[in-house]
Structure formats: structure tokens, C-alpha cells
């Protein structure tokens, strides 16, 4: 199935101590961001996201009938991805879903969860702020590879047929 991507960004602010240079503060924020990127893949973070107020999330992919815990975790790890923009202390969060509105909702709930409850993962000396609200891609970000492969094969055969007929 085609999936849309919603991107949001969170700025990680390390409360600096006197005598610490800005480079060290940014490097500290990067390290915290790397840790958070790993924590976002966990079931604990998933539970916090789905209870985040202000968002209506479609959880059928994660909690539908016959979905095992292992399947739920794999799907969650594919649905939410995050990475640190190096040199900035900015955490880039992407959410994927078949419905663009749901992709935006999952990205928004994820970054709001980080701002509200991220201190549980990194301690109290770090604060986070949403610097870019979620924005959805206009076109699907994850195409259906099987359909694209079959269509590519068919178009290739048709084009080769046209080329072969013109050469005769």
C-alpha cells in the first residue's frame, strides 16, 4: 500500500552550566537526540503516543484482531522514524501511514509526547520544543514496489514492442 510521510522537528535544549562552551552543549543535545531516536521505537513510547490528548489515531494496524505483540512492535518501528540533524540538536521525526491525515496525526502526537514526557527518558536537565509542526508530503513517500515492478515490466515490454515494430 502507498504510504504518505509527515515530518516534524523537535529542538533539544540542554540547560547549560556556567563555563560550558556552546559546541559542547550542541554535542550533548545530539547525543540525547540519538538516545531519544532509539527510545521512540519502544513499546513504552508507543503507549505514551496513543494516550496523547488532542489526536485521533487509527490504531487498527497496531491493535487490530490477530495482531501479536511482535507484529505491533515491528509495525510501530516502521511507522515512526527519527534521526538527529547533526550539528544542530534538532531531532527530525517522520511518521508513515496510508492516510495523509493519520500520518500527520501520528507525527504530531509523537513530537507532542516528546515535549510533554521526553524528560522521563533523558532527565530533567533537558527540555524539548517543537520547532516544525507536522507537514505531509503531497505524493506517497513509500510506493508499492510490487505494483511498480509489474507496471515497469509491462511498460518496458510495450516500448520494446514499439521499437521492434519501427525497425522492421
Segments (PLM) and residue ranges:
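Hydrophobic and amphipathic membrane-targeting/association helices
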Residues: 1-168
Amino acid at each position: 500500500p502507498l504510504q504518505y510521510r509527515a515530518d516534524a522537528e523537535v529542538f533539544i535544549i540542554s540547560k547549560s552550566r556556567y563555563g560550558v562552551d556552546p559546541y559542547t552543549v550542541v554535542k550533548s543535545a545530539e547525543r540525547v537526540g540519538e538516545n531519544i531516536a532509539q527510545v521512540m521505537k519502544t513499546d513504552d513510547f508507543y503507549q505514551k503516543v496513543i494516550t496523547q490528548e488532542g489526536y485521533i489515531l487509527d490504531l487498527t494496524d497496531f491493535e487490530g484482531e490477530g495482531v501479536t505483540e511482535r507484529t505491533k512492535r515491528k509495525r510501530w518501528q516502521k511507522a515512526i522514524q527519527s534521526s538527529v540533524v547533526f550539528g544542530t540538536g534538532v531531532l527530525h521525526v517522520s511518521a508513515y501511514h496510508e492516510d495523509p491525515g493519520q500520518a500527520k496525526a501520528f507525527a504530531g502526537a509523537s513530537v507532542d509526547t516528546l515535549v510533554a514526557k521526553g524528560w522521563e527518558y533523558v532527565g530533567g536537565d533537558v527540555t524539548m520544543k517543537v520547532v516544525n509542526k507536522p507537514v505531509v508530503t503531497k505524493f506517497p513517500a513509500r510506493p508499492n514496489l510490487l505494483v511498480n515492478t509489474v507496471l515497469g515490466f509491462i511498460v518496458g515490454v510495450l516500448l520494446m514492442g514499439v521499437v521492434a515494430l519501427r525497425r522492421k
